[in-house]
Amino acid sequence: MIDAGRAYAVGQGGRMVALEVTSGQRLWEQNLAGISTPAVAGEWLFVVTDDARLLCVARGSGKVRWMHQLPRYQNEKKKKGPILWVGPVLAGNRLVLANSEGQLVYASPEDGTVSATVEASSGPIGLSPIVANSTLYLLDDSGTISAWR
């Protein structure tokens, strides 16, 4: 994600970084692993990690403002059935994430608290939702596109 002359990236190798686009200078880094592009709003970045943590990170310093643990497994006790998360995107003053259980999850950008979980698909959702013209679009792993307002 590139915004205001800075690139923000997170990778499965375990690093989230902020880089100055023109010089390539590393401004900060965090020990976070993920595959989804961070969402940006004002002075904050929102990112979901491989271990199902939703975080709010300061754009300027990389300091974590808050962290919210999302469900990691279908059966948390036995650690069976891992749940994979994608997103977030900011839509209607809420963070929206999707997961491998076919769910859309709405969370507060203020503290990460989950306000709603919706069954959006009968199968996994492996791509982040996108927002265009006040509509949230989902493409599930079976190729079905759905639109949400």
Range-by-range predicted roles:
Residues 1-4, 11-13, 25-41, 67-89, ...:
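Extracytoplasmic beta-rich repeat domains
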Residues 41-55:
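Acidic (E/D-rich), amphipathic helical modules within compact regulatory domains
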Residues 85-109:
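C-terminal hydrophobic structural anchor segments
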